[in-house]
């Protein structure tokens, strides 16, 4: 019975610790995150995805606001609809002209960890924005899982 109380107390303490944490704990800042901007071309985005080995990348406005997420699937659909354009035509297609099928939903830096965890269950990364919608970085599912795995190992 005393062991159950200790376990309950330990769980409660862990919940309180998580509630006190904030999104900055997991943030990879914008300077360390590959992203594309609204005036980039289809070719530039394809090359950036290939170079970094990503399957999705944040799309930002020129003023730094988060617009959405471009995925490999978005690019494939665009190329199919344009009859697989050659490299020269790809240079003329602005990335904002590419239809996005699904955006990674952003979280505001001021939101709760629960909001972050809810979003990260369905996305490989969660874009993080300030209260004005300016992109400040991402939180990856991998970082959250590694943190949680470390917590489990320590208990």
Question: At which residue positions do the language-model features occur?
Answer:
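Bateman (tandem CBS) regulatory domains
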Residues: 20-33, 90-103
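Cyclic nucleotide-binding regulatory module and flanking cytosolic helices
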Residues: 8-26, 84-91
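Short beta->alpha transition motifs characteristic of CBS
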Residues: 54, 58, 66-82, 122, ...
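The conserved cystathionine-beta-synthase
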Residues: 35-54, 60-61, 105-123, 129-131, ...
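Short, small-residue-biased leader/transition segments that mark boundaries at the very start
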Residues: 1-7
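Short beta-to-alpha loop/turn elements within the nucleotide-binding domains of ABC transporters
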Residues: 40, 70, 93, 111, ...
């Amino acid at each position: 019975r005393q062991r159950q109380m200790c376990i309950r107390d330990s769980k409660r303490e862990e919940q309180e610790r998580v509630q006190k944490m904030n999104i900055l704990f997991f943030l990879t800042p914008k300077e360390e995150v590959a992203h594309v901007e609204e005036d980039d071309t289809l070719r530039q985005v394809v090359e950036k995805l290939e170079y970094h080995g990503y399957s999705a990348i944040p799309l930002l406005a020129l003023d730094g606001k988060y617009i959405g997420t471009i995925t490999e699937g978005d690019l494939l659909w665009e190329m199919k609809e344009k009859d697989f354009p050659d490299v020269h035509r790809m240079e003329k297609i602005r990335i904002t002209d590419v239809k996005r099928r699904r955006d990674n939903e952003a979280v505001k830096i001021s939101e709760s960890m629960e909001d972050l965890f809810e979003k990260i269950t369905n996305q490989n990364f969660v874009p993080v924005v300030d209260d004005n919608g300016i992109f400040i970085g991402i939180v990856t599912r991998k970082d959250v899982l590694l943190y949680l795995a470390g917590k489990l190992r320590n208990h």
